């Protein structure tokens, strides 16, 4: 890029666009390497959680906010109304939990077409005081009945046309297990997906 720029054959717009692609691809590759390292740590029992008392709602809000602009840029609707209820503090690793939130929201946006909707909500009931549910539903392509049981397996990708390593949900599932939680997925081909 530098040689072309020095010779004056590359206009500013093309240069900026090229740099944008380079930065985007660098981020994507870094993300894949981080997922592989996380999965390796989980498999070898070396993943350490830094558990602390945290506001789970604030962590989820940050994840939604982080992806909101991307949704707008891609012509998708990311819907989330922050609950007005005060939630009890949770004891967990805020960075790892946020990683799960970002992974699931990212997948929902990735597999939802332009004009589609990704809706997120946080559910807490005093009837189940030890459970906080975060539900993310999309109007994307969905997952076939054949593929659904396999989506949390490492390197499994139901849809080969969309980028990614195929280990994000496997890592997210393991992180939730380490927090005594679960990652439940309901889906149907052509009807979207719900992750709780």
Predicted regions and their residues:
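Conserved micro-motifs of the catalytic ATP-binding
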Residues: 44-49, 89-92
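Short helix-loop "hinge" at the ATP-lid/N-box region of the Bergerat-fold HATPase_c
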Residues: 108-109
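Short conserved segment of the HATPase_c
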Residues: 143-155
């Amino acid at each position: 890029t530098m040689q072309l720029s020095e010779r004056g054959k590359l206009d500013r717009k093309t240069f900026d666009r090229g740099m944008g692609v380079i930065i985007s691809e660098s981020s994507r590759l870094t993300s894949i390497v981080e997922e592989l390292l996380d999965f390796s740590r989980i498999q070898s029992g070396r993943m350490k959680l830094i558990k602390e008392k945290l506001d789970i709602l604030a962590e989820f809000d940050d994840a939604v906010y982080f992806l909101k602009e991307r949704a707008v840029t891609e012509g998708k609707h990311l819907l989330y109304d922050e609950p007005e209820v005060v939630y009890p503090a949770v004891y967990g690793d805020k960075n790892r939990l946020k990683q799960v939130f970002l992974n699931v929201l990212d997948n929902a946006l990735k597999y939802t077409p332009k004009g589609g909707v990704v809706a997120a909500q946080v559910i807490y009931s005093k009837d189940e005081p030890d459970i906080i549910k975060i539900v993310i539903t999309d109007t994307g392509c969905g997952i076939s009945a054949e593929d659904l049981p396999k989506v949390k397996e490492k390197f499994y990708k139901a849809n080969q046309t969309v980028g990614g390593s195929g280990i994000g949900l496997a890592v997210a599932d393991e992180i939730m297990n380490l927090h005594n939680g679960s990652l439940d997925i309901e889906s149907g081909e052509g009807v979207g997906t719900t992750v709780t």
